[in-house]
Regions:
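Conserved acetyl-CoA-binding loop-helix of GNAT-fold acetyltransferases
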Residues: 116, 122-139, 158-162
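Conserved beta-strand in the GNAT
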Residues: 59, 65-74, 110, 115
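Conserved GNAT-fold acetyl-CoA-binding loop/helix
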Residues: 22-45, 56, 90-91
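Conserved GNAT acetyl-CoA-binding A-motif
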Residues: 107-109, 137-148
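A short beta-loop-alpha structural element at the N-terminal edge
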Residues: 1-15, 23-27
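C-terminal "cap" of GNAT-fold acetyltransferases
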Residues: 143-157, 162-163, 169-195
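A short helix-loop-beta-strand connector motif used in the catalytic cores of GNAT acetyltransferases and
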Residues: 46-59, 76-80, 110
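Conserved acyl-donor/pantetheine-binding loop and adjacent beta-alpha core of acyl/acetyltransferases
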Residues: 74-109
């Protein structure tokens, strides 16, 4: 079932985040190892107001286990969502005025992360999470959803295009190029229920 995440899901969500964003976790935590980053990521997921907060996550649960996650939020909320994270990065790196590259256009509901446990890949869970998120966004009156896909991951791009996302432009994040894909919500209505 696709459901809203709970605070206690953090320990299962964090490895999925790490799997999806890899070394970006170091930038988001101001650390240099996964061992250092993991407790900070768990804190982010458990927090009430953060880009990675459980409030921004939908999860796929099977057999009592979280096997997939999709994280999304409105781009205009990032200045508030990132406040505490930027303070943590600043403190850990001992630098002032840390900035994070802009990942989404202001009008977009942005998909930050989509990740499925390796043992459950190829079973349609990524598609189900995407469709659940799009259904959730439609019910909230959101007009457009966007995401960045690594240009080195053509299979991920195919998944997004299969669901209906379209290429809009190239975006550079942390000196790496990503294809920026968008989905106008009015285009399609999904029946995936989120509980």
């Amino acid at each position: 079932m696709i459901r809203l995440a709970k605070r206690e899901d953090a320990k299962e969500i964090v490895p999925l985040i790490v799997q999806a964003i890899e070394d970006i976790v170091f930038m988001l935590t101001g650390t240099t190892s996964y061992e250092q980053a993991t407790p900070i990521l768990e804190y982010y997921v458990q927090s009430e107001q953060n880009r990675l907060s459980y409030h921004n996550c939908l999860v796929k649960e099977m057999d009592g286990k979280v096997v997939g996650v999709i994280i999304a939020y409105h781009s205009l909320e990032l200045s508030v969502l990132d406040r505490e994270m930027l303070e943590i990065i600043s403190r850990n790196l001992n630098i002032q005025n840390v900035k994070v590259d802009k990942e989404a256009d202001d009008e977009d509901f942005y998909i930050d992360t989509l990740s499925v446990h390796p043992g459950y890949q190829g079973k349609g869970i990524g598609t189900e999470l995407l469709e659940g998120l799009l259904s959730f966004a439609k019910n909230k009156g959101i007009a457009r959803v966007s995401l960045n896909v690594d240009q080195d991951k053509p299979s991920a791009r195919r998944l997004y295009e299969k669901v209906g996302f379209k290429y809009e432009k190239v975006r550079f994040i942390m000196n790496h190029s990503y294809d920026y894909l968008v989905f106008p919500i009015s285009k399609k209505i999904f029946e995936t229920k989120v509980v």
